[in-house]
Amino acid sequence: MDVPVAVNEDKLLLVSVGYSACHWCHVMAHECFEDTTVATFMNEHFVCVKVDREEHPNVDKVYMDTVTMISGSGGWPLNCFALPDGRPVFGGTYWPKASFLRILSLMASMYQEQRAELLGQSAAIHDACSKMYSVKKADAGSGVTRIDLTTTTTALSGRFDHLLGGMGEAPKFPMPCVYEYLLGYAAQAEREEKEERERDGPQPEAPYSATRPSPEAESERVASHVAFTLECMARGGIHDQVGGGFCRYSVDAGWHIPHFEKMLYDNGQLMSLYSHACIQMASQDGPPSPLLPLFRRVVSETASFLERELLVSVPSDREGESPIAFLASLDADSEGGEGAFYAWTHTELREVLGETDYPLFADFFGVSDSGNWEKGLNILKCDKTPEAFALSKGLEVSNFLERLSAVKSKLLDVREQRSRPGRDTKALTAWNAMTVVGLVDGYRALSDPGLLSLAVRCGTYLRDVVMGGGDPEGSGLTLLPGQLMRVCTVSTPEGADTPTVSLSVNGFLEDYAHTVAAFLALYRVTFEEEWVISARLCADHCLQYFPRDMSGDGTTTTLLPFTSSLDPALPSLTVETEDNVIPASNSVMCEALLSLGALCTTASGEEGDTPPYTTIAKNMLRDVSPVFKQMRGLGHSNWARLFLQTLTVEPVEVCVLGPSHLEWGQRLRREVDGLCVGARVLIAASSGEGSCIPLLSEKEALYTERGGPDTLVYICAEGACMPPCDLDGALDTLHRLM
């Protein structure tokens, strides 16, 4: 990764990494980079490179891992010093002006006077990073067991904050994939306990053991804590009580005061998480959870926020509604400072709401005359759900909800007149794909066709624009089949009547993984095979250009590198395995390949065409197993969810063929969602001829032999396929199997 200017001028690189919505990035830019003294010194002694981490996460990861290794923590802005060939030597995060000048002076003098020491330090960092990214091919017998998952759950449970929700101390991040795993673990444990009770009949109650609680007690505690955490987040200031959507994290332990930037990836994933919680709650025996209405509103209001504030229409020659994309983020800052757009004085609220509504809703939103934040400002939060608050005040719930909706509309109208936070101008492929999945999950939870429409239009953008064979503006950009571009900017040049689209940055593994997942999510609710075709095209490109055996000698992992072989080499070739706020790209691709393989595998167990998606995915699970067990699954929650599915879920295949395939497929899909067993059941549907999906084309031959024309359902489970049946028979069979 030589930087010619740095090589020619014999200077260190100073790589500064940030992103549009980062508050402290803007602070350091103003204090240091815009200061004449600092900027002059930087330009005299260094070759300075500014990097948007959202556009180039591969560069960010190389230098962030270095800084984390050196200091024990990371964050943005990220400032890293590197040799002219790009190898890092030292770095840190935010530095105020005086500290930054001292560090600049020290690094400049060390490069001139102690270069050998810097070279040695760089070599040590490079070796450490190479070991970090080296995941060897594991033995077949080293896989994760159910006991390992119990260990993971116990370790996570030990970090629960039972008073305020979430885990650990401030700052608190939502961490959707952690709670997705815990939701799945609790649901699976509940199913197993139910099966055990039905099999064994009533049993005498076992004595409680504080050191070894029963699985049932653990599953109940896990499910309860997930619901409690989602409630606390929904009631807190991290959730925009007026406009919907979530901020990036809470600076306090009680989810009250957010760091006000709003990120697309958070909101897409949280839509999925709250939707899955809704589906799980709705499927439980007995009365519905009192939290279900709150969680439904969170899903709906988050989608409304995305549509209102981040959506852009993308030019297209296709008939019908235009494709859409969602922009990456909203800044924390506006003209009034950090959070000013979202905060209220009690005087402002009283003027907007009037004397009739103000006392009640000031109480509901935790407003005080002196403010509940800083400088007399209030961040709206709720100590109770709307339903619980209404009952505590002796009010009719439905009437209070109507008044609350009207109050939110008034506040939103007033807020829209304020100076707005900066909005990023780029759309990122991976984050849009996450949002497609979130919208699909929201549709499955709420049965709101508007959410499905948004998902399809954004999926169309992913398929036809960023994977569509070239830049619509004729920039000379030519894409290979299935290749993705990461960054899309939609803008209207001065004097032009129509917006233009500009694509840049070759896609990274996370773009491919999430896009394949998005296409498959759309197929599951539309049964339109074009989504499977696109998923295969995208996955095949990824498997070709993200080499699995990077050593060439067959000894390295089947896990995929983060960067395509089409891109210039970086100082380290990163392999992302750790699930963070965004799950590891390898874990997402692994799940996508498992799903794709299920559609492309026949009853004989053969995968229709190469590459063998299922085999690759199983090898990925095998190779990540040693590090998963070493870490007790901590930092690997999405992997834990995949292991849980593959260890405990016997998949059921449902193929619907015939003239009513769409209607029947949708009916069966709704039934599966109602039973909360979506991960266990694969539903595919076709008219009965010409399917491009191997799982269906195999059944089409059987369907044709019967002569049609009736619609039939073919169900395979537990290694055996049952005789074809009608819709009622299929529903009965699913209930029996579940």
Predicted regions and their residues:
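Long, polar/charge-rich, low-hydrophobicity segments
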Residues: 282-283, 308-318, 467-513, 520-695
